Amino acid sequence: MTPAIYLVKGRDKSLRRKHPWVFSRGISKVEGTPKLGETVDVYSFEGKWLAKAAYSPHSQITARVWSFEQEPIDRDFFIKRIEQAQLLRNDIIERDGLTGYRLIAAESDGLPGITIDKYQDYLVCQLLSAGAEYQKQTLVEALLHCFPECHIYERSDVAVRKKEGLDERVGVLHGELPPKSVVIEENGVKISVDIVGGHKTGFYLDQRDSRFQSMKYVKEKEVLNCFSYTGGFGLYALKGGAKRVINADVSQPALDTAKFNAELNGFDISKKRAVFLNADVFKLLREYRDQGTRFDVVVMDPPKFAESKAQLDGACRGYKDINMLAMQILNPGGTLLTYSCSGLMDQVLFQKIIADAALDAGRDVKFVERFEQAADHPTDTAYPEGFYLKGFACKVL
């Protein structure tokens, strides 16, 4: 008999709207002794069947819904979800000429806690939930059915797994260990990805659309690319005809890859055109401000400042300070391209932070364009939490 959980009276409303999470405070009782990650049936307080979900007793999100249909959660289920996700992305892949893209965007693709990025013939899995870990072998079998020629590598080296009672894991799940450099292409730009040692699963695929849209602002401009990582925005700036691009990052290996990427695309990397600067961005911006160094375009794409609600106030201060500094080093009429990947910070709050930064910088600033995550990172209508990346193009007068 399948284990089951019963909800507190009245706590079934979100599930009836197809939201995929059940919180611990919403559960009245558990029937049976489900294992960590095992599939359970979810019932309302009155005993009406609602969903099949993965059980995670250590997490505040105690159950994550696999399906709102009475169906087995087996190999065929995962094959169906993967095929649906691939079909959703086929037009995007053709349009943007992609050899690297997000195949599975967790809850938004009906596979909670599972993120899968495809880089050429390498599928890179990040399994964030107990249910994802429990179904790992079944998931691998389904992936091999859909992509029989692919190697599969796990990058579940993320702290959030501890909340699920899981250890961090990395390693080969099928095939060969990825090489140090796997070259992908997007919008005609070649990018070297370090799957094993890079950030996230190797690269920030979610910023692809923003990178492409940034090109309209950079022609014949002096561009400062902050938190450049392996140079994504810098590559598009060079492609878009920027006069000069300074890529600033605290990681020398990332800067080395950024330089390699520029060479890979045949761009001029003389110091007159491209600079790769190892620096703390906060300190660098203050130095530029105090020295009177100015730019036409500043790209501000920092790492996530808020991992929890307790960190949100500090994150707000950090975002405000860094955007204020960016505004202070822009020439009149310059463009600030600024982004936040903190899911806890919604677009309204981020917009207010930019407004506060403008006041502190003493600059008149206009929002002229809004950005969000790339199209292969969809957001399900029932899961607004899937919308996490937001950005603005601002004219600084």
From Swiss-Prot:
SMART domains: PUA. Its EC number is 2.1.1.191. One of its GO terms (molecular function) is rRNA (cytosine) methyltransferase activity. InterPro entries: PUA (IPR002478), PUA-like_sf (IPR015947), PUA_sf (IPR036974), RLMI (IPR023542), RlmI-like_PUA (IPR041532), SAM-dep_methyl-trfase (IPR019614), SAM-dependent_MTases_sf (IPR029063). Belongs to the methyltransferase superfamily. RlmI family. Specifically methylates the cytosine at position 1962 (m5C1962) of 23S rRNA. This is Ribosomal RNA large subunit methyltransferase I.
